[in-house]
């Protein structure tokens, strides 16, 4: 199956030029943000685990496409983070097609990702290798809503400043694949022999994690020229947290992080609204459980809130030291592999 590899490059100018001192005719850096509700209706199967997906019976928190549009006067790009674990490429291609037709923004200037929440309804085909001839009702819906969200972010474009940084948060990421003592049965989740054990629990046969983790949270921040927070896009290599209510639709810690950042920055009830998002990083072997110690019993959503708060607190502490830029050059490269 062909896949896209996208590289986004933001290179700041060597000297940031205050907007008031820009040479005549120089275009300001613009940013616009928006969200679009992509919550499915109840009854669809909640995906992310093995076995038959159970039907969704309750919406604990709404799912969104969180949209960021950046424009340096020459290049315009859109970044979208969707609260969904599975969205077929064909659905994303259709969202880009709609967006290009409505705005002229080229499809290769749009990056769309999913958060990997395990409490969403799938927007991919039942057999990803054999797409159906027609989209399901939810696939049509989510494609429209992604396109709508980016269009609204374009409508909200305004002169802005940009900054970026990183902060380490090692206490919430753990390798879920472990080397085990000789003689331990090693089967993967599909029942096939393996060299390590995935999600081994607090087994007495644990030796050590089979690989490293990436503790870094990277983030891009946007603010208005008056210094009002506009948007924040973060990335963390944590699979998901889980521990939701039974048969609940939820954005998991990704959604709580967005709300908590807005609260910590004092950016609620703005017009246009502040938008934060946490995108999913390189987390294939990383989850939120440290199997080296007993796992404490939590109430539904308790661990989600704990993780989201620690991430948001770490980012907002680093936010205070950001060096803001009035200008930044944008580029986006796409290669099909």
Write out the residue ranges for each language-model feature.
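Bacterial N-terminal signal peptides
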Residues: 5-16
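Conserved beta-alpha junction segments in alpha/beta enzyme cores
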Residues: 22-113, 117-274, 279-282, 286-292, ...
């Amino acid at each position: 199956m062909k896949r896209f590899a996208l590289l986004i490059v933001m290179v700041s100018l060597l000297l940031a030029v205050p907007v008031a001192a820009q040479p005549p005719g120089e275009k300001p850096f613009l940013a616009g943000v928006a969200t679009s509700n992509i919550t499915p209706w109840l009854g669809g199967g909640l995906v992310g685990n093995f076995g038959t997906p159970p039907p969704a019976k309750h919406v604990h928190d709404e799912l969104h496409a969180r949209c960021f549009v950046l424009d340096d006067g020459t290049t315009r790009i859109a970044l979208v983070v969707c609260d969904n674990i599975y969205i077929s490429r064909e659905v994303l291609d259709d969202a880009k097609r709609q967006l290009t037709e409505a705005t002229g923004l080229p499809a290769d200037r749009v990056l769309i990702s999913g958060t990997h929440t395990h409490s969403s309804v799938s927007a991919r085909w039942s057999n990803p290798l054999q797409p159906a001839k027609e989209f399901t009702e939810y696939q049509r819906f989510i494609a429209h809503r992604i396109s709508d969200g980016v269009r609204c972010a374009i409508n909200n474009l305004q002169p802005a400043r940009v900054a970026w940084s990183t902060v380490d948060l090692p206490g919430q990421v753990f390798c879920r694949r472990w080397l085990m003592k000789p003689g331990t049965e090693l089967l993967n989740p599909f029942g096939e022999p393996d060299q390590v054990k995935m999600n081994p629990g607090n087994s007495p046969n644990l030796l050590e994690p089979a690989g490293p983790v990436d503790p870094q949270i990277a983030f891009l921040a946007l603010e208005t020229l008056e210094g009002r927070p506009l948007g924040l896009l973060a990335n963390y290599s944590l699979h998901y947290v889980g521990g939701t209510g039974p048969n609940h639709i939820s954005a998991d810690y990704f959604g709580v992080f967005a709300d908590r950042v807005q609260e910590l920055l004092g950016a609620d009830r703005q017009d246009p609204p502040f938008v934060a998002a946490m995108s999913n990083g390189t987390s294939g072997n990383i989850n939120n459980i440290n199997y080296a110690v007993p796992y404490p019993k939590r109430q539904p959503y308790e661990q989600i809130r704990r993780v989201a708060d620690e991430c948001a607190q770490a980012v907002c502490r680093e936010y205070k030291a950001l060096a803001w830029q009035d200008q930044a050059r944008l580029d986006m490269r796409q290669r099909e592999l």
